[in-house]
Amino acid sequence: MKYSSLVERLQGKRTSAWEIHHAAQQARARGEDVIVLSVGDPDFATPEAIVERAVEALRGGDTHYTAVVGREPLRAAIAREHTRTTGRAVGADNVMLCAGAQNGIFAAALCLCEPGDEVVVPEPLYLTYEACVRASGATLVPVPVDAARGFHLDCDALEAAITPRTKAIFFATPCNPTGVVMPRADLERIAQLARQHDLWVVSDEVYADLTFEREHVSIASLEGMAERTVTIASLSKSHAMAGWRVGWAIGPAELIGHLGRLALCMLYGLPGFIQEAALVAFEHKAQIVADMREVYRRRRDVVYERLSRVKGLRCLLPEAGMFMMVDVSGCGLDTVEFTWQLFRAQGVSLLDASAFGETANGFVRLGFVVDEARLAEACDRIAAFVAGLQVRAPVLNAG
């Protein structure tokens, strides 16, 4: 049987990077002692008040169709929070609910881009951005971000990548996988380029609430940007609700209308009981997020302190989020070999970061998704594996 060219455009190295994670999940299901640090699904349970509201709504019969773009009370709550953090007034008409941020990015790409367009994206970039852009028929143009700069954007390189075919700039701040938070000066420069070249900006801000040392700034807060920015966010990371699939897109009301028509054909609305639970998540947001941020900060510090002592590894201290980039190029293996050999030898799954772009070659991504004791054990296993490589290397060289 024949399939459309779309399925080919969705294939690629970036989406195949999950193979080691799937192998780790299968090993864990068989009862093997594995530590899975290869994906951003934390070990926290969703806060009880949120769960109880979902159960209450289910028992109350909230199991019918809902408004395609989302119920007004939840959209209004999201709009109020966005207004508070950006200083730019938006309302429920500027918000559409999505089945997680991933769904929002995909929908935005389809509504903004078409064949012949180019989308400029700093690299390393999140794994699925390329497939989302290619699904629209557009071409993703990566802008390499040098590890020597701590993976901070070179705005001159971004400007050089813009052509008459450029339609949009996509980026994440804080960034997955690097944990970099874009400073205001870089965002001001991107905003200036977007206004100058009449470009859309899609800003993935899923980790905005989980910043450590550097304050998060939304590009939608800058002058002249609200009307050309699509802000994507979710409750997945900030509230330990990855499996609930609650995300949203914020943008001009006209765009929300287009997204709604796409959602009519694609999603047909989030379940009502989930939306009711999400409202409770917003009511308790301040405390939940503060607690979550502190846990991730402690976990980050545990991993950084332990792995920074391991000869052959170089850790980059993340400014936000739940991941750390670790340079393993000093170990004598490429990242595919390193991750798979580590997994088979020590039962720890990390993600080969080269899947996020060539600029991440030599790095692996480690997630702070288990408790501190388990993270410490994972670090010990990684250290033992690296030490074993260094013991074997002289023997191999002598042979």
Where are the language model's segments positioned?
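Phosphate/diphosphate ligand-binding glycine-rich loop within oxidoreductases
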Residues: 36, 55-68
